[in-house]
Amino acid sequence: MARRTTTRVKRREKKNIEHGIAHIKSTFNNTIISITDRHGNAISWSSAGTIGFKGSRKSTPFAAQQAAENAAKAAMEHGLKEVECYVKGPGAGREAAIRSLQAAGLEVSVIKDVTPIPHNGCRPPKRRRV
């Protein structure tokens, strides 16, 4: 008879982090929220796509709100209480994600726009003709 091998399941360790950074990347197609510690190590992340929104629904403020709530709940399990929000991109879910982080119980201390703006760098793509 063959021996049964048992695999040990390693549990995620609980990090006791009170202050963190919420990186909100809001594009025209999706919204991604990553919550990290002060050094940039990821605690939790979520996006409109991972929650189950598909296609054009991913770019809505409601999808960003749901993604932010999901990321905040996962981060609060590690003891997170206060976040700085770094917002990047021109998408519709910017403000909705910040409001949702506050509603989930995280204290937002700083809101900073870190959208990259070129100093006339690469040539932009051609205009769409619909």
Swiss-Prot record:
Gene3D superfamilies, sorted: Ribosomal protein S11 (3.30.420.80)
The keyword Ribonucleoprotein is assigned to this record: yes
Keywords: Ribonucleoprotein, Ribosomal protein, RNA-binding, rRNA-binding
Molecular function terms from GO: rRNA binding; structural constituent of ribosome
GO cellular component: ribonucleoprotein complex; ribosome
GO biological process, one term: translation
Pfam families per the UniProt record, alphabetical: Ribosomal_S11 (PF00411)
Assembly behavior: Part of the 30S ribosomal subunit. Interacts with proteins S7 and S18. Binds to IF-3.
PANTHER family: 40S RIBOSOMAL PROTEIN S14/30S RIBOSOMAL PROTEIN S11
Family to which this protein belongs: Belongs to the universal ribosomal protein uS11 family.
Cited HAMAP family: Ribosomal_uS11
Known role: Located on the platform of the 30S subunit, it bridges several disparate RNA helices of the 16S rRNA. Forms part of the Shine-Dalgarno cleft in the 70S ribosome.
Protein name according to UniProt: Small ribosomal subunit protein uS11
Native organism: Syntrophomonas wolfei subsp. wolfei (strain DSM 2245B / Goettingen)
